[in-house]
Amino acid sequence: MTLATAKGFATMLRQLPLTLLLCLSAAVSRAEDVGRFSNDWTGNGIVVEAVPDPKVSGVTCHLVHFDRGVIDRLTKGNWFENPSNSSISCQQTGPIVIGKIATGTKGEEVFSERMSLFFKSIAVRRIYDKTTDTLVYVAYSRQVKDASAKMSLSTIALFNANPTWSAGKP
């Protein structure tokens, strides 16, 4: 086997789990890849995605997470699983127009992405803090087995943002 053939085969193997996940996943991702780079010699990578809030225009969250490479998958198994570690940062990226959002303490999910074939995903939830007039975004791991406390937080204070509330301010 030539080096070019081996590299092509390795690329195909690396993309296979993602292709299968996309085929089996009923949820449609609204995130856009804005960055992707390798962080070690085994081909493991870091993925940066832009996630717009579907009910709050003018807000974009950037979510970063790990993507396992072929060598890592071969040596450790778990072909169809990525770690659920993530980090989030949300910013005002335009005039803020807030639609009908959940204002209870549970907030509402604005994004979810599978990190394995079954039961594991990264989710982003928005909570409105009425007291401080702040949008709170929490990125967290949803894992059935061995639930973990992997999460990160980002906030957008609405104090100087002069948002428009299309359904009226709560």
Residue positions per predicted region:
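N-terminal secretory signal peptides
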Residues: 32-89
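A low-complexity, Ser/Thr/Gly/Pro-enriched, surface-exposed linker/loop concept
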Residues: 85-104
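Bacterial N-terminal signal peptides that target proteins for export
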Residues: 4-17
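Sec/Tat signal peptide C-region and signal peptidase I cleavage site
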Residues: 27-31
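Bacterial N-terminal signal peptides
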Residues: 17-25
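Low-complexity intrinsically disordered segments
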Residues: 98-170
